[in-house]
């Protein structure tokens, strides 16, 4: 198994699919990485040379991935909450942030139903 950005990449899958195992790298980003390095997206990781894997590693290092990306996302949410803006308040209360209805739906975000106390 090749190790890129601190993640074990599966050997028996295509390069494009294997790169998506890295948090922050989707199909489109994986295809652009393959194009930038000149690696065949349909080639399996086990068939690549060490030089090609190093090229992939260097290209992935240019992108914010894994822990840094998670930290950045959490800092953005924390910033909204500290500002006290509408989106920050919705995050703080655990409600949907992007304008979805909450009268009947939003059970995932709100959690299980709470019984009405009399």
From Swiss-Prot:
Organism field = Pseudomonas aeruginosa (strain ATCC 15692 / DSM 22644 / CIP 104116 / JCM 14847 / LMG 12228 / 1C / PRS 101 / PAO1)
**What's this protein's name?**
Small ribosomal subunit protein uS13
For region Disordered, the annotated ranges are 94-118
Q: Which PANTHER family match?
A: 30S RIBOSOMAL PROTEIN S13/40S RIBOSOMAL PROTEIN S18, SMALL RIBOSOMAL SUBUNIT PROTEIN US13M
Q: What GO molecular function terms would the record report?
A: rRNA binding; structural constituent of ribosome; tRNA binding
What's the family? Belongs to the universal ribosomal protein uS13 family.
Matching NCBIfam families, A to Z?
uS13_bact
What SUPFAM superfamilies does the record tag this protein with? S13-like H2TH domain
Function of the protein: Located at the top of the head of the 30S subunit, it contacts several helices of the 16S rRNA. In the 70S ribosome it contacts the 23S rRNA (bridge B1a) and protein L5 of the 50S subunit (bridge B1b), connecting the 2 subunits; these bridges are implicated in subunit movement. Contacts the tRNAs in the A and P-sites.
- Keywords for the protein's UniProt record, in alphabetical order: Ribonucleoprotein, Ribosomal protein, RNA-binding, rRNA-binding, tRNA-binding
Any one biological process term the GO annotation gives: translation
Gene Ontology CC entries for this record: cytosol; small ribosomal subunit
Taxonomically, which superkingdom?
Bacteria
Keyword Cell inner membrane among UniProt keywords? no
Indicate whether GTP-binding appears among the record's keywords. Answer: no
Q: Which is one Pfam family of this protein?
A: Ribosomal_S13
> Subunit arrangement?
Part of the 30S ribosomal subunit. Forms a loose heterodimer with protein S19. Forms two bridges to the 50S subunit in the 70S ribosome.
């Amino acid at each position: 198994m090749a190790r890129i950005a601190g993640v074990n990449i599966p050997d028996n899958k295509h390069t494009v699919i294997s790169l998506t195992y890295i948090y922050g790298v989707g199909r489109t980003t994986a295809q652009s990485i393959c194009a930038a390095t000149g690696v065949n997206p349909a080639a399996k990781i086990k068939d690549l040379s060490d030089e090609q894997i190093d090229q992939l590693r260097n290209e992935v290092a240019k992108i914010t991935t894994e822990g840094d990306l998670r930290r950045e996302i959490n800092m953005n949410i924390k910033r909204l909450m500290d500002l006290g803006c509408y989106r920050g308040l919705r995050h703080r209360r655990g409600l949907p942030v992007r304008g979805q209805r909450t009268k009947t739906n939003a059970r995932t975000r709100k959690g299980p139903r709470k019984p009405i106390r009399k």
